[in-house]
Regions:
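Histidine (H) residue identity feature
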Residues: 2, 16-19, 28-31, 125, ...
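Histidine-centered catalytic/metal-binding microenvironments
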Residues: 24-184, 235-236
């Protein structure tokens, strides 16, 4: 979790509050970490508990609590902006996190090991605004207005707002993706809303989830592709409090016969975890190997044994990724790497990329003029941002026709760690911290 973003430089806008469900996923992760830490603590003998608290429990749980503080603040601000009564619930959750942070820190200083390490956790660890803790601050909350009357407010997954009328669309469903999306029916009044959801097509499934504040009802929408032979569009009608909103559903049936490990474009995006390659080609005894559970989402790939640079694009060991492009046009390939530095002084971190049978071109994870280990001139901000984000990006523009294409990633600089690839149609990428959820893939 701390490898995603350090707690002291996490803010309400770090993780996107709606896109790709990443704030909700982070909230779930924080609660899971807290439960794991509590479970282990309950199994330890008394003589081991002080060491466990100082070395494991406090870093994990206090860090997760700071993350939650910011995630709840983001929910509060978003709900308040659109008049959702649940904004006040999340403002209260932020207050609870602040109180819990004080309790955890006080226990570390005053009670753990009979106060042996008193003062060790007095330094600020929330909301840094500079490189140090000067002018640190708690995340801000908004005391949104709560209506006296029921009012339906609908939010569809990945959208940027709640609406009380008109139409919204869920992201596409694909026959290879097993996607499920969240549909929320919220109330401007602090009360449970009597909501009616109807859909005339039996291939659309709607299931209510038992989670969230009382003024927000959460529904999981999925598609049963066993009932479809071709791409279909449908509509969910959401009705409550004399309001109605139409929710568009598109179920895409992939009819092409595709090679194994081919990713399918969805809403103009193909997102691929690095370990899900179609081919792994070694060179001179060097090959890409998987680093399990290292990286922002799933894992990472790195060339071993280390120590060899390949200065000519395309001559190093390679990973290949197969993609189905459903709409031809201009695309951007973003390659997400760990924020590693070159193992040799004076060199930048590089890889090479080619498409299909085209020639390979060199890509740097940070432009030379913006690469400066240890900080320095403001032009080095890209490198510095990579430290905070714990990743660097390389981007390549390409024109692709409709159909199946192969992306080849070649090693150039020893030590490069590949985490994720995102191919996006021009204008279709949404703002997010982790990037899009992995696309559906043929296995």
């Amino acid at each position: 979790m701390h490898g995603n973003r350090r707690p002291e430089v996490t803010y309400p806008d770090t993780y996107h509050v709606t896109h790709y469900g990443e704030s909700s996923k982070m909230i779930h992760l924080c609660h899971r970490i807290k439960k794991m830490a509590d479970d282990i603590d309950g199994k330890l003998p008394e003589e081991a508990k002080a060491s466990y608290y100082g070395l494991v429990y406090y870093p994990a749980v206090a860090g997760a609590n700071v993350q939650l503080m910011n995630l709840y603040a983001a929910k509060n601000q978003f709900y308040a902006k659109y008049g959702v009564a649940a904004a006040k619930d999340y403002a209260e959750k932020v207050k609870q996190c602040i109180t819990y942070d004080e309790e955890l820190t006080n226990y570390y200083n005053k009670e753990m090991a009979d106060g042996k390490w008193d003062g060790m956790m007095l330094s600020a660890h929330i909301g840094f605004t500079h490189w140090n803790d000067e002018d640190w601050k708690y995340p801000e909350t908004v005391q949104g207005a709560v209506s006296d009357e029921d009012k339906l407010l609908v939010h569809a997954a990945d959208s940027d707002c709640f609406v009380s009328e008109g139409e919204v669309s869920l992201p596409e469903f694909t026959s290879v993706g097993e996607e499920t999306y969240l549909l929320q029916a919220a109330n401007a009044k602090d009360a449970l809303l009597d909501v009616i959801l109807t859909c005339e097509d039996d291939f659309v499934s709607i299931r209510e989830l038992s989670c969230g504040p009382q003024s927000v009802r959460n529904f999981e929408v999925s598609v049963d592709f066993s009932k479809l032979t071709e791409t279909k569009e449908s509509e969910i009608l959401v009705q409550a409090a004399s309001c109605e909103v139409k929710v568009k559903v598109k179920a895409v049936v992939i009819t092409e016969k595709l090679p194994s490990m081919t990713f399918v474009e969805r809403d103009g995006i193909v997102s691929m975890e690095a370990e899900h390659f179609a081919a792994n080609e070694s060179k001179d005894g060097k090959e890409w190997k998987c680093l399990k559970e290292y990286g922002k989402t799933l894992s990472s790939m790195k060339v071993y044994p280390m120590g060899t640079n390949f200065d000519k694009p395309g001559e190093g060991p390679s990973l290949s990724y197969s993609v189905l492009i459903r709409e031809g046009g201009e695309y951007t390939l973003r390659v997400i790497t760990a924020p590693t530095n070159s193992l040799e002084d004076g060199r930048n971190m590089r890889y090479a990329v080619s498409f299909d049978d085209g020639s390979a071109s060199e890509v740097k994870t940070v432009l030379d003029e913006r690469y400066n280990i240890g900080g320095g001139h403001s032009r080095a901000r890209d490198w510095a941002e990579g430290v905070l984000n714990n990743c660097h990006y390389g981007e390549t523009k390409v024109t692709l026709d409709k159909g199946v294409h192969t992306i080849h990633i070649y090693s150039m600089e020893s030590g490069l760690v590949l985490q994720k690839l995102v191919l996006s149609h021009e204008g279709d990428a949404k703002e997010s911290y982790f990037g899009p959820t992995e696309s559906g893939v043929v296995r």
